[in-house]
Amino acid sequence: MQKNKGMLPILIVGAVIIIVGLLWLNQDISSKQAENTGVISKQLVELTDENPTFDFWGKNFPEYLDMYLKVEHETPKYTNFGGNLAYSKLIRYPQLTILWAGYPFSLDANEERGHFWIQVDQMDTARNNKDFLNAHGFAKFGGQPAACMNCHSGWTPWLIKNAANGDFTAFNSTKYWTMIKNVPTRNGIEEGSEEHGGPHGGKRMGVTCADCHNPDDMSLRVVRPALINALVDRGYQKDAAQGIKADRKEMRTLVCAQCHVEYYFKPTGEKVKVMGESIASDSSKKWWNGTQKTYDEFEHWRDGNKATEIEVDGINLTFPWSAWKKGEVFRIEMFDEHYDAVRPIFKEDWTHKETKAPMLKIQHPEYEMFSGGVHAANGVSCADCHMPYIKGAGGKKVTQHNVTSPLFDINSACKTCHTQSEEYLKKQIADIQKSVAFDLRSAEYATVSLIFDIKKLREELGKLPAYQSEGKPDDAKISKALAEPLELHRRGQMRG
């Protein structure tokens, strides 16, 4: 009995220690859970997809908004192989004008400036200027479709739901300049004002918080139908809240896969009713070359121009992943397999001006190529490097939302895993990038040589009666004879 009494103080002290420990642990867990919220405004608004503007969502998360908008006012930064200085790639890499001969990218292609500017630059590119295209031999190019807005405008989900009545095909098949006229006004912006045409909640608004976050709890989600459709085809399951069933680590890459991918506009083989413009019936409205305007290349309805209903060939933004199954590492041959399978309905992006090869322009398949890299193999996500954790206000851990090159903050982006010095890492990165760039330039120059060889061969064959019709070179006969080298041009340039 005396022995039990002696144990009582010890038990009491032990219980106190356990209780204090549990309280501390609970506080620490709560702190960890709140680490990524940053500074939260006391003037909270109810977030909704009806107002996806970052200025509105930023009312609740001002620290993140400040990070995101930093790129709007800072001096553009150049890196050896990237950055956000919008230089002309055609001037720096003139071989691209030959590789893309016959395609609008041969006229205008600039380094990207980032998520804030992505819609501004898309609307301002010469590839979206019909008079410019007409004047440079691209009169047959009918202008960009709204499908291009999928990865440039934060208004895309709203426009699919409201302007296209939930019809993804109708959205994609509408003209770009027609669809942009339907962007609504929010945050007190006046219809048709300069702000309504601008990047802050207007028609030039780029990527927004809503593109990656659920308004209910700010968890990660994907909202672009093309990615959801492609992932389901690969073996993923749809999810009402996230778009796709995946854990948070994978979602930190999938949100980027909404746009940083290869894609094409797949014909549906059917006509679809879409929004048109009454300007098409106004015989006084012509392009500079005298042809009839079918849309007004302006972001607002004006001068009596109004919406009509027209019928066009349907297209869908599609990711060519049918041969790439869930859990597999991507291989470039998977693109070959997909494009070969759809060739009866989608032959090419364009016919090369010099070789007449049926070409595919590979866009920006970062997600696909990343899947086979050392970082993906070790469980690293896109956000780990391009949106690293940093110390925010009050020393809290937050995600960097000034999405940029890891080179600008190696300490946060790289040294979490890599223990070497910043100087060593910078040199290592530079060596790898230079090696890849050397191989890429070598492949491009070799392809240019092939183009010149095929062009010369076409000219020589065209002199022979067997490859002529009515005494003139017959391109169809020549292309049939050169089917193998033309196919090698197509596939080789896809890889270079």
Ranges and model annotations:
Residues G102, L107-K140, Q144-A146:
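Long amphipathic alpha-helical scaffold segments
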Residues M7-G14, L23-R113, K161-M205, D216-D384, ...:
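Primarily the internal scaffold of c-type cytochrome electron-transfer domains
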